[in-house]
């Protein structure tokens, strides 16, 4: 019931709900039959200590080497017969914690050092070490380390909310896209909180350090949606849902402009689920110079990406616990593969971070009061990665890839009657000066009367991406733009507000000039002048 039936306990969120949202109703989990419980023939540690260099940490000196799946499947078969082939998947939930949710919380977060772990958290054999090694670091408490790690077989502890993540492995054969954030040299994460196949599987109330709660209603209970690349691989969206262009094509077509709807819902009429820009042309397709991850933690590793994607994240549906609304820009590979260098990892999504600087936030506080900061490799470094539209938005509205000769723009934001967000985005080739129809700026006539402060609305027509600037002539008058970019397209006119404010003692009249300069061809300039008066 917890996994499939919406209730007050699971806050209305189910495994089926997640997959139905991501797949637009194509894939779901509508039936789950429970068997057991069964008493395992061996203690928990006999299964949990068989991984991550823990095998020799058993209380009785034996070597841990057992798999829970074999024993539980045998008990199930003896009880009910051989039913395994009757089901698409077998989920084994054991009474205990999933080590992924407790190794840090009941290890280095709870104890200052491995030598300070008290007896109740230690190996029952006092002659054995108090600690055990674990997946990412050298030690955790024995009690935490004896737990099993969730696997795509599919195996989960009672605290684990990452069943959706493991199903991604099991049903669709998609690998992890995550780094090891705990070892040096540190390397930046791939997609972080923005995709369920990375640490977005940890999203939910309380975040990553609340994944020990039973039942799993806190961290990891609301995983992020899937990015464009993974939805394409799974067959959840098709090329028809996207606007797809290529680097070479942009060189001959001029800028491309499109509206993209938030990924948690169906694209609105006339809009797309995302934009794809393929890196085609002469080899190498990805022309990013190789950098050494050993000295540059922000390096994406081996230049091997096939295309850019742009999509919109809105904090609704299963994206509710994403940290921001905005445009998600990423590099993607068609095939999975490791990204090279020290601490390399399987990386097929590489989010472009609008704020690549250190986020400078505390991860946790040790028992002795010492603050532990999030490292450059922590997935939450990408919490502020999204691009926004307009000036003073708290983020960037454009991104230039000089090496791959592309310029991306976040041009405007829109909300419909249901408050669904969509963005107008654009892309152009840095090697093209083509403008399909030059932009023309038109000013309102006659002179406008302004009472202290107000708005002058100019009109833009044409088919191009342009950069705007505004100025005012008149004593004591100020002028501001909320957006530095505009992109009329498809014969549609765009209304551009220019905001004015008059100070006490200002001149009675002023002139406002709006200038639009083509991004592709800076020689194409249009301007218009409006008169205002008090």
Regions found by a protein language model. Give the residues of each.
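Long beta-sheet-rich domains in secretory-pathway and surface-associated proteins
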Residues: 431-534
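Short beta-strands and strand-coil junctions in structured, solvent-facing domains, enriched
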Residues: 86, 316-319, 503
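Generic detector of solvent-exposed, compositionally biased contiguous segments
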Residues: 14-81, 163-167, 171, 243-297, ...
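Extracellular hydrolytic enzyme modules, especially secreted metalloproteases
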Residues: 97-319
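Propeptide-to-catalytic entry region of secreted or membrane-anchored zinc metalloproteases
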Residues: 1-163, 171-184, 190, 213, ...
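Short coil-to-beta strand junction motifs in C2/discoidin
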Residues: 321-327
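Residue-level signal for secondary-structure boundary sites
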Residues: 100, 205, 318, 337, ...
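Residues within well-ordered beta-strands of beta-sheet-rich folds
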Residues: 91-93, 309-313, 330, 497
């Amino acid at each position: 019931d917890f996994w499939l039936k919406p209730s007050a306990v699971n806050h209305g969120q189910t495994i089926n709900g997640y997959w139905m949202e991501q797949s637009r109703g194509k894939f779901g989990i509508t039936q789950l039959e429970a068997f057991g419980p069964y008493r395992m023939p061996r203690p928990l540690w006999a299964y949990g200590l068989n991984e991550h260099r823990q095998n020799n940490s058993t209380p009785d000196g034996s070597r841990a080497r057992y798999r829970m799946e074999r024993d539980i499947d045998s008990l199930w078969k003896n009880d009910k017969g051989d039913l395994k082939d009757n089901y698409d998947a077998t989920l084994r939930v054991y009474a205990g914690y999933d080590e992924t949710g407790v190794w840090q919380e009941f290890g280095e977060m709870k104890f200052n050092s491995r030598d300070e772990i008290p007896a109740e958290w230690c190996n029952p054999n006092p002659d054995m070490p108090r600690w055990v090694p674990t997946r990412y670091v050298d030690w955790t408490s024995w009690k935490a380390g004896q737990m099993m790690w969730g696997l795509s077989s599919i195996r989960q502890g009672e605290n684990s909310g990452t069943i959706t993540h493991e199903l991604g492995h099991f049903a669709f054969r998609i690998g992890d896209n995550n780094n090891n954030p705990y070892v040096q040299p540190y390397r930046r994460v791939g997609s972080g909180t923005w995709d369920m196949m990375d640490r977005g599987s940890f999203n939910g109330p309380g975040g990553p350090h609340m994944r020990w709660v039973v039942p799993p209603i806190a961290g990891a209970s609301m995983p992020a949606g899937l990015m464009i690349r993974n939805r394409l691989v799974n067959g959840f969206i098709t090329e028809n849902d996207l606007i797809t262009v290529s680097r070479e094509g942009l060189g001959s077509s001029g800028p491309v402009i499109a509206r993209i709807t938030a990924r948690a819902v169906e694209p609105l009429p006339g809009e797309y689920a995302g934009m794809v820009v393929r890196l085609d042309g002469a080899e190498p397709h990805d022309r990013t110079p190789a950098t050494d991850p050993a000295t540059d933690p922000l390096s994406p590793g081996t230049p091997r990406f096939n295309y850019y994607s742009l999509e919109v994240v809105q904090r609704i549906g299963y994206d509710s616990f994403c940290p921001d609304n905005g445009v998600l820009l990423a590099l993607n590979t068609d095939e999975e593969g490791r990204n090279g260098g020290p601490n390399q990892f399987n990386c097929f999504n590489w989010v472009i971070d609008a704020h690549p600087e250190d986020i400078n936030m505390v991860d946790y506080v040790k028992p002795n009061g010492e603050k532990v900061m999030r490292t450059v490799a922590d997935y939450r470094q990408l919490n502020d990665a999204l691009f926004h539209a307009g000036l003073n938005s708290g983020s960037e509205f454009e991104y230039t890839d000089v090496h791959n000769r592309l310029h991306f723009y976040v041009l405007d934001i829109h909300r419909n009657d249901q408050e669904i967000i969509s963005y107008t985005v654009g892309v152009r080739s840095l090697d093209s000066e083509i403008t399909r129809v030059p932009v023309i700026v038109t000013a309102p006539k006659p002179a406008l009367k302004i009472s202290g402060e107000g708005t002058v609305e100019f009109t833009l027509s044409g088919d191009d991406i342009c950069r705007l600037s505004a100025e005012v002539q008149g004593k004591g008058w100020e002028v501001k733009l909320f957006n530095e970019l505009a992109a009329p397209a498809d014969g549609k006119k765009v209304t551009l507000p220019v905001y004015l404010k008059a100070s006490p003692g200002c001149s009675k009249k002023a002139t406002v000039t709006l200038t639009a300069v083509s991004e592709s061809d800076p020689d194409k300039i249009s301007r218009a002048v409006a008169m205002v008066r008090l």
